[in-house]
């Protein structure tokens, strides 16, 4: 049986569409960006999608800003050298907060970032308590506090930074079950509040992958808000108004930075998302 798993020197085996389509790169340090890609694909199903994830340097939340900027620019450059891009989505909150200026300076195509959905959450809350669930890096960054001051200064913001949730989301996509008891332990600071958040911002693209489990643990009626739909709408607008005419007839493809057993285990998941082939990107 022919395998769809390939290294960088093997030609793509997947059937290719006949009509040229705009090429969109979705990038994350791990698989969390698939939640953003899924929203974009629902709105724009007929694009040529490339998903790239940095399984060598994952997770980014513990890396320095200088490292993240240099690494993201290097990876996007490597993809651009293989496929002329119409647009890139940096589907990682940590990378978005630090790398967008460098990317926009280097590349002519639009680059879309991800920011915590604090503004819509502040509008939705009924009790005035908004939870921000993110990585520790996102919780600490000045940009996050600027968003809160600008859009949610009348709300009580309960921030919870967790790297463990990122690992749980990755493990779920690898086929592991998610421990609700572990989730309760992570969310205990909120669950013990006299008035817990009624609206929770999923401030990491991994966290929508845990939506069902989070709703089982958080108080009944809690709203979960993320940026996926807004990013999809922004992508559609930019492709129509500002993106270069970079089109491809190739099939959707996923890139990892190292062909590890863990990356190989993701192939069935990537195929469910429409990526028939996984290759190692030479960087």
Swiss-Prot record:
Q: Active site annotated at which positions?
A: 92, 204
Task: Summarize where substrate binds, as residue positions.
Answer: 28-29, 60-61, 93-94, 205-206
Q: State the EC number(s).
A: 5.1.1.3
Gene Ontology MF terms in the entry: glutamate racemase activity
Q: Name one GO biological process term.
A: regulation of cell shape
Q: Which UniProt keywords apply?
A: Cell shape, Cell wall biogenesis/degradation, Isomerase, Peptidoglycan synthesis
Q: Which reaction does it catalyse?
A: L-glutamate = D-glutamate
Asked whether the UniProt record includes Cell wall biogenesis/degradation among its keywords, one would answer yes
The answer on whether this UniProt entry bears the keyword Isomerase reads: yes
Write down the Pfam families for this protein, in alphabetical order. Asp_Glu_race
Record's InterPro entries?
Asp/Glu/hydantoin_racemase, Asp/Glu_race, Asp/Glu_racemase_AS_1, Asp/Glu_racemase_AS_2, Glu_race
- Which pathway does it take part in? Cell wall biogenesis; peptidoglycan biosynthesis
Task: Identify its protein family.
Answer: Belongs to the aspartate/glutamate racemases family.
Q: Which HAMAP family match?
A: Glu_racemase (MF_00258)
The entry's function note states:
Provides the (R)-glutamate required for cell wall biosynthesis.
Annotated protein name in UniProt:
Glutamate racemase
Q: Which organism is it from?
A: Salmonella typhimurium (strain LT2 / SGSC1412 / ATCC 700720)
């Amino acid at each position: 049986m022919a395998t769809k798993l390939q290294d960088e020197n093997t030609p793509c085996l997947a059937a290719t569409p006949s009509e040229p389509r705009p090429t969109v790169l979705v990038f994350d340090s791990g698989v969390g960006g698939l939640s953003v890609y899924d929203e974009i694909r629902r709105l724009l199903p007929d694009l040529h999608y490339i998903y790239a994830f940095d399984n060598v340097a994952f997770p980014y939340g513990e890396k320095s800003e200088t490292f993240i900027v240099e690494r993201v620019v290097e990876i996007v450059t490597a993809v651009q050298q293989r496929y002329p891009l119409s647009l890139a989505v940096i589907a990682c909150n940590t990378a978005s907060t630090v790398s967008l200026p460098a990317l926009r300076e280097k590349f002519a195509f639009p680059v879309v970032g991800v920011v915590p959905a604090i503004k819509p959450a502040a509008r939705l809350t009924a009790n005035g308590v908004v939870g921000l669930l993110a990585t520790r890096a996102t919780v600490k960054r000045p940009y996050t506090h600027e968003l809160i001051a600008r859009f949610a200064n009348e709300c009580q913001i309960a921030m919870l930074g967790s790297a463990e949730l990122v690992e749980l989301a990755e493990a779920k996509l690898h086929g592991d079950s998610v421990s609700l008891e572990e989730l309760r332990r992570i969310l205990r600071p909120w669950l013990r509040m006299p008035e817990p958040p009624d609206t929770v911002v999923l401030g990491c693209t991994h966290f929508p992958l845990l939506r069902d489990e989070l709703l089982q643990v958080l108080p009944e009626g809690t709203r979960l808000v993320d940026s996926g739909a807004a990013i999809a709408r922004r992508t559609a607008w930019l492709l129509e108004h500002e993106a270069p005419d970079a089109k491809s007839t190739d099939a959707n493809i996923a890139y990892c930075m190292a062909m590890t057993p863990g990356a190989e285990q993701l192939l069935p998941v990537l195929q469910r998302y429409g990526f028939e082939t996984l290759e190692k990107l030479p960087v």
